[in-house]
UniProtKB/Swiss-Prot annotation:
It comes from the Bacteria. It holds the Pfam family T3SS_SCTL. This is Uncharacterized 7.1 kDa protein in nolU-nolV intergenic region. InterPro entries: T3SS_stator_protein.
Length: 65
């Protein structure tokens, strides 16, 4: 059996059944986005601090051997 290669595949039709985010929850999602952004900024600050502390300790330990 061979496939008919002249026929283009048909893309599936996807339709949402309702609003993706109900209007009543928009503020909650906006607040969650702000919280996530703040958490990412905090994570970056902690990583920078930890990297600097590690480098300080490594530099301090190097002369002692």
């Amino acid at each position: 059996m061979t496939a008919d290669i002249s026929a283009a595949p048909v893309a599936p039709q996807m339709r949402p059944l309702g609003p993706l985010i109900p209007a009543s929850e928009l503020n909650i999602w906006h607040s969650a986005g702000d919280a996530l952004a703040a958490a990412k900024r905090h994570q970056q600050r902690v990583r920078t601090w930890a990297r600097a502390a590690y480098q300080r300790e490594r530099a301090r330990a190097t002369p002692r051997g």
